[in-house]
Amino acid sequence: MASIASATTGIPAAAEPPSHVAGQTIDANISDLDSSDRVIRLRAVRSLGVFGAAASDALRSALDHDDPAVRYLAAEQLGEIGDAPLKAAKPQLEQLAADESSLAVQMAASFALCRAGDLDKHLPLLIATLDYPERGTACSAAALIGKIGPEAKQAVAPLEAVHQQHRAGVKGGDYHRGGAAMNALRKISDKNN
C-alpha cells in the first residue's frame, strides 16, 4: 500500500500508485467519468487524483468534460498532484482560466496554475472572488488560496480583511466566510503546509 503524501490531498507520495482507491481500479474510475450518474462521475474524478501521476492523462481529458463539476475537480486534482502532470496540463488550464463560462472552473484552473508557479497572473482571480456575493464561491476561493500555501502571501491582507469583516460576532458578518479566510491564513503561514 502506498504511503500518503498529505492527509489533506490524499495524493500518493510513493512513485508506485495504489492499485485500488475506494475499491476501484484506475480503469474503473476512468470508465465512471462517462456515467450518466453525476455522483458516480464526481466520485471517479476525485478518486483519480489519489492515483496521482498515473491518472494524469485521464484528468487532463476530464478538463474537457461536459460537466463543469468534473472540470473543476480535474483542475483541482492536477493542481494538487503538481509536477509533470500539472506542467502537461498547463495549456488546457490556461484556456479554462481565461475562457471558461463557469467561475468555479476558472477558480480551480487558476488554483492549479498558481501551484505551477503562475501566481502573479492567476492569484488575483482567487483574491477577487473572496468578495463574491455567493457564500460558497467566496469560501471556495479562500480554501483554494489556502491550498496554495505560503506562496500565496500576497493574499494575506485581503484574507485578513475578509476575516475581520466576517469573524464571529460581527454584526452583518458571515462567520462561514470569516472562518474560511482564517483557515486559509493558517495554511499560508504554515511553513510545513
Segments (PLM) and residue ranges:
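Bacterial N-terminal signal peptides
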Residues: 1-6
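Structural detector for internal amphipathic alpha-helices that build alpha-solenoid repeat scaffolds
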Residues: 13-23, 39-53, 61, 72-84, ...
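Amphipathic alpha-helical scaffolding segments comprising HEAT/armadillo-like alpha-solenoid repeats
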Residues: 19-32, 53-64, 83-98, 119-131, ...
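Short inter-helical turns and helix N-cap capping residues of alpha-solenoid HEAT/ARM repeat scaffolds
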Residues: 36-37, 66-67, 101-102, 133-134, ...
